[in-house]
Amino acid sequence: MCIRDRYNRNRPYDDLVPEHIAAYFNADMYITTQSPYNLMGTGGNFMSDGMGTGFSSKLILDENSGGYAWNGPSGNVFYPNHTLSEIEDIMQDFMGIQTYILMETLPYDGIHHIDMHMKLLDEETILMAEYPPGVADGPQIEANLQYVLSNYNSAFGTAYKVVRIPSPPSVSGNYPNTNGYYRTYTNSVFVNNTVLVPFYRQEYDTIAQRIYEEALPGYNIVGIDVDNSGVNLIAYSGAIHCITHSVGANEPLLIQHQSLEDTPPLSSYTVLANIQHTSGVNTAQVYYTTDLATGFSPPITMTNT
C-alpha cells in the first residue's frame, strides 16, 4: 500500500513518485490531494511507532493553514486549510494515527523536519540529538523532549526511554547557529537488521556508531559519508532518511514485542508478542540470549491466545 500527500515545495515529479512505486509493485494507492482529505506534508517530518502514535513538528500546521504557496505550471498553488482536529482525522484515516504528538519547530533547522534531530528506535525508545549547552537548537530540543516525556507515554503505557547522540560541528567548529551545516546522526534508515547512518568525520562517527550499537544490539550499523566535499548531501539540509524515509516490504511481517527489563536469570517470566502476516501465522517461537557472543537459546514455542 502506498500513500501520497503533496510535498510542501514545488516538485511535481517528486509528488508522482508514490504512484510509480505503487504501479511497479502493483500496490494499492491512497492519495490525500483531494478535499476534504487534501493534506500537505513531508516524509522527513513524520514518524510512527507502528502502534498508532505519530510524531511531527508543528510545521504540519503551517503547511495546512491556507493561503498562497507558490506558482505552479498550471497556476497558483494554495496550502490546504485545515484545523488541527481535521489534520488529526486525516492522519487517523490514512496513517492509523490515534495519538499525534506535535513539537515546536527548531529555530536553526530551515526545513523543520523532526528527522534532523530525533529517531524512533522502537516503540519505547527515542534517539534524540544533543548539542553543547545553549548552542544552536539545543535549548528547543530539550524543551521538546521534556514536553513529550511529561505529556505522553509509549504505546505500551511506559515512559519513553531516551538515548542521546551528539550532533557534530563543521571542521571549523561551527554549528547551525554560526553557519554550520545541520549535521545529524538521527537521519538514519532501518533496512531489515541493518541501519544506514549518516557519517561525517571519524572523531565523531566512532562515537555515533558506538551509541547506535549499544542501543540496537544485534543490528549492523553502516555509516554513509554525507559530508564528502565531492557529493555533500548534508549541504542540502538532509541526509539518508530525508531521501528515503523507509524501505517497505510487499508482504511485511509485523512483530510487536515490549522489551523485558530486569529479568532475574532464576525467575520465570512471560513473553508477549503481537505477530501478524497477510497469510496468517501458524506457529511462533522465541529465541533469547543474554550475550550475543554466545548465541541464542533453543526455540521455545509460543501459545496463541
Question: Where are the language model's segments positioned?
Answer:
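The feature marks the mature, well-folded catalytic cores of soluble enzymes
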Residues: 4-253
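Glycan-association/targeting regions that enable binding to alpha-glucans and other polysaccharides
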Residues: 247-305
